[in-house]
Amino acid sequence: MTTLLSIPHKQILDRRNIIKGAAALATTAVSVKAASAATAPPLGQTGAPTTASEPLPLGPLPGGRYPDSHLESAKKGPPSFGPPDFPAFAGTMAVERVATGFRWAEGPVYFAAGRYVLFSDIPNNRIMRFCEDDGHVSVYRQPSMNSNGNTIDREGRLISCEHSGRRVTRTELDGSITIIADKYNGKRLNSPNDAVVTSDGAIWFTDPIYGIGGYYEGIKAEPEQEKHNVYRVDPKSGDIKVVVDDFVEPNGIALSPDEKKLYVIDTGFTDGPNNPSQIRSFDLDVSAGKVSNSKVFADMPKPSITDGVRTDTDGRVWLSVGWGDPNEDGVRCYTPAGELLGKIHIPETVANLCFGGQQRNRLYICGSTSLYAVYTSVQGSMKP
């Protein structure tokens, strides 16, 4: 059933720029090398070349021995399997590079019906598609308005946060695009970054200024909003309201599996060394559309920051880590109480992550120029 979010600001984009449905997507599947080939920048593109460097090799990361040395538990355990409370540490789990050749991979989201991952390649102004069953990679949309974070709503529609569009959009099942939010109090948003959808259909999103700071990941512009807020879009009226206004740079956002907690990352450290590099948790009242009881869930080891966040069905919190010590690049896993369980080491700066796979236990990781994957022993909460 379509919510009234489809009513305000509806805009149909050129159908030539939209590849509709899983069947149409399949016809565009190309090799990783072909997907990274240079193309002329279409209208709205930043003009950045569509190749970054020589693609990295695919497959398991170097090491070739179980247990995979890229999986590190915070606690000591049996040498082969490790402690059971870190669900990415088991005898035959291995980190794999499944696609490469991008410029800055971000915002992965898994579509179970088609068994594919969509993710943004922000500077190249495109959304990519990784087909899980055969490993093919294709361009899902170009231009993408320098989309960053992506999620999926309860009706299976793609929700995207666009830098150069400075808006949140929804791709309808017929391929048309609806603008969900582009202004607050009559002024343009900064550059929406990441979003989640609660069970009532409300869309919650973050709005830092990263996409308007220059021409690499968007279009340089002056911010019109005084603060960098977290917003909620009402599922019935389409009204937009501020739910949190005290972040330096709100970034990744996620829900606990029971929707009683909202997690929001603050990457304010990128604006100055005295600013936070942390993730905060809030008590969430979905029906009231409000949050309360803000707490620091975890601090990152500066100068590293966390960018993306997901949860599993047991309430563990999975965070991307990068931009600081290369030894910290990767993913961190925490208990619901904020205790560090373990790390997944990735040889590139990591921006974001999502769970996917037929059993919802495969963790996909966007690491700079590549998409990585590792099987775990838990299931993602699959809350978008």
Regions found by a protein language model. Give the residues of each.
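N-terminal secretory signal peptides
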Residues: 1-17, 24, 39-40
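Asp-box/WD-like beta-propeller blade repeats and closely related beta-sheet repeat scaffolds
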Residues: 172-202, 208-218
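Beta-rich, blade/repeat-based domains predominating
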Residues: 100-116, 143-162, 167, 185-205, ...
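Short loop/turn segments immediately following beta-strands, especially the blade-tip
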Residues: 282-289, 376-381
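A short beta-strand motif characteristic of beta-propeller blades
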Residues: 96-99, 136-140, 178-184, 240-243, ...
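A short loop-to-beta-strand structural motif that recurs across blades of beta-propeller domains
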Residues: 126-128, 167-169, 229-231, 278-280, ...
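Short, solvent-exposed loop/turn segments at conserved positions within beta-propeller repeat blades
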Residues: 123, 164, 213-226, 271-277, ...
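Blade/loop signatures of beta-propeller domains
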Residues: 51-93
